[in-house]
Each structure stands twice: as C-alpha cells, then as structure tokens.
Amino acid sequence: MVPDDLAGLRKLYLGFTSSRVILTANNLGIFDNLKKASSATEIAKKLKIDPRATEILLDALTGIGLVKKGGGRYRNATVSNRYLVKDSHLYQGDIVKHASTMWQNFSALDEVVRRGRPARRGFDHESFIMGMHNLTVLRTESLSKALGLKGVKTMLDLGGGPGTNAIAMAKKGVKSTVFDLPETIKIAQKVARQEGVRGIRFIAGDFHVDSIGSGYDLILLSQIFHAFSAEENIALLRKCKTAINPGGRVVVQEFPINETRTAPPHSALFSVNMLVGTEKGRCYSPREMKRWLTETGFKNIAIKYLPETVLIIGER
C-alpha cells in the first residue's frame, strides 16, 4: 500500500502528464471536433494526425474526465464543451494555448534558477492577449460591482491587453480608454469590434516612458504589477496620480499572496512563471502594494478581495 504522503508527492511530480495531454489536445483542435461523438479514426483523418496516437490521447482525455467514451466513440464531457470549444461564450482555449508557452518557459527553470535570468523559449503574443480576455471576461461584473461606477465618467485601462475591462465599462456608459503596446492595441481593437462596442479610445505606447493622458476618474492597473519590480511599479503609480482627476481613484488588481509569499499555492507558482518569463517580476502581497499607494500620495486606501483576485484602491 502506498503511503498517503507518497501518493500526494507522486500526484505533484506527475501532474505535468495531465497538463501535457490537455495542452496537446487543445493545440490540435481535438475538443472542437468532439461536440458530436466520433471514432478515433474519424478524428485522426479529419485532423490529419496518427490514428493510434489519437486513440491513446482520447483514452487519456477520457481518463481525466474531459472526454466521454462509449461504443468505441468519443465526445466532449460537459466541461470541455463549456470551456474548450471555440463557439462557447465561456471559451478558455486561448489561455490554455498560452499555457503551452508557459510549458516551454518552465522547462528552462533549472537554467533560470542557476543564472537568475529569464530564458524565454517561446512566446505567442496573440494567444497570451486573448488568453487574458478568456480570464477577464469571467471577472468584469464582479469588478464593476466591487468598485461601484457611480460618478465615474472616464476611465483608463492601463496595460489593458484585450481591453476586456474597458469594453465592459463602456457598455455601462463610461468613456473608456485602453493604453498598451502597439501590437496589443490591434488585438484590443479587434475584440471591441467583435463585442460591437464603439467609442473606446485606444492609445499605443510604452507606459513606462510615454504619456498616458489625463483627466481620468478611474485608472485600472489589472494584472500589471506582477510583471515588474517594486521600483517600476511605484514610478507607474506616480504617473497615474498626475493623470487622475481630483477625487478619482487608482485600482490595482492582482493575484493575492500572503506576507510570506507562500500561499495560496497558485500565486506562489505564478511568481515562478514571472521568474522564467520576466526580468524583475513576481507576485506582491496586498500590504506591499498598499504601502506603494501610500508612498505615492494616494489616500483612503482600501483592500478588497474578489473570488480570484485582490483589489487595492486609492483616491487622489
């Protein structure tokens, strides 16, 4: 009999096997072709992949609960139809595709820990940005409720990626601006068109060096700080303070991590993701970020916890 602690350890160090099966199935388009029951041979022929390998992959997907098998035919489990099929409004396939990039970067972790420098082995910009859209679309309503948009006429989604938060607020009547790098702004404009939202202002630039505009009632920095050093984040907050109207707010949204930087596990592991993918990034505790807002002159600072993230809110 395997001791419980050893079974737990095995689950941890072999966790990559389930992950790789999901990533490969997503990359190959398996889930999009299993909305209706099909045989392994049919799927292999349609996707031009090896029949034997396809059958083994489908059996593994069945074993981990993402596919159902019966009478020699396979179809998506409910969870796969909901999140891994492109025509679902809850589609998460882009962020799963981005996880394939993370896989490559994490594979360089030995080297990164030895040298202390990131070693990006691959990066798909569009899947990363659209992956952010996959995640953010699930959180926009809870964010708006937590903030309360009364009196907010203008907002800036700084480093806004796909512009998901700005789009959601524009739908509520807020004059919204998205600021990000030029290649990212192109994607955000496409997302806005797909959502049928007009009137959003898009500014392309580098927020570390370029003007971000002014006259905002609210500036949102959602999932920005973890990519940079404390010094860079403080400088960014100073820039935000000059761009916010008197009485306006800055809102930082991040993954929460405790003061010892060890929990929750997702955040501690996400810091490793920043280690392998950025020069100076990691997760920061709410207390650290609150201290930065105090240092840069914001007042009435509040910390609010949402289901997956934490907000640090300060007033000018």
Task: Tell me what each language-model feature is.
Residues 151-161:
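Conserved class I S-adenosyl-L-methionine
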Residues 8-16, 20-33, 38, 46, ...:
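Conserved Class I S-adenosyl-L-methionine-dependent methyltransferase catalytic core
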